[in-house]
Amino acid sequence: ILNLSYVDYDLRPDFLLTIQKTESSNTVCVAFEIERSRKSDERILRKLGKYMDRTQLDGLIYICDSGRLSETIRLLYQNNLLPKSEKQKRFGENFFLFSDSLDGGGEAFDRLFNACGKFTSFKNWCGYLGSTEWPKRRSEDLKIW
């Protein structure tokens, strides 16, 4: 799923959630990153780029220690990687979700937003990933969330 080499050890997610295939849904693999401190732009971009283009992940969720940190990471992705990615060009707005829930004020999965800063429901997002094959996923299909 991750397709990372040994030298990419520091680029592995904090944990990986796999929702098994059922009769009505596909297997869904979502990586989670928990960020408590600011990393360099170069390191963040390298990590996000590898998740986007070198893995078979269905999605990635960044849970950050503050709203400022999650916004910084979101803008790095939106401005630097999203416009260039061939693999993510149709679903890129919703491949990464971001949260500042470590900052307090709600459940971790109640405060998720996509690369454009729009609220996204974790349950609906996972449901969409499970019910829609990769080549058919489109960000515009998620506007009802």
Residues covered by each model-derived region:
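Active-site metal-binding core of divalent-cation-utilizing nuclease and nuclease-like domains
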Residues: 1-30, 36-40
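A generic secondary-structure signal
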Residues: 18-21, 50, 79
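Non-catalytic C-terminal interaction segments of nucleic acid-processing enzymes
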Residues: 42-46, 56-59, 63-145
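Core beta-strand-centered patch of the WYL/Sm-like small regulatory domain
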Residues: 28-30, 35-36, 40-51, 60
